[in-house]
Amino acid sequence: RQKLMVASYLGGCAIGNSFVGVVHPFSAGLSVVLKIHHCLANCITMTAMGQFYPQAAEEFLRMAKKQKVNIPRGVCGNLTQDQYGQLYRATIIHEKPLANALGKEFRNILTAEKTKEIFQAM
């Protein structure tokens, strides 16, 4: 158990200081607020990342289609304003990866309204 806890801690440190970009914060929001498993949340998030990673998003979607991976769509279509607020807060809290990907002024890019639009595209 002790080794597993140390490994988990080190993994968290690695993610927190890496260039995981915009995907992980949005995925974490889906996991925290909507209880979607992390791996699936990453896949769902990639469906709305074209504006940040056009080539990678296109390649990901092409590969998912080729492999017949069924990625749920519309998971954020009928949420309440409170849920969108929770998603925003659960996403924007990941300051390090967002700053790494978008710069120190990432909050000017990922406003609550912009974040809602991105989630609605999922």
Labelled PLM ranges:
Residues 1-68:
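Active-site segments that bind and position negatively charged phosphate/pyrophosphate groups
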Residues 61-122:
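C-terminal charged capping/lid subdomain of soluble metabolic enzymes
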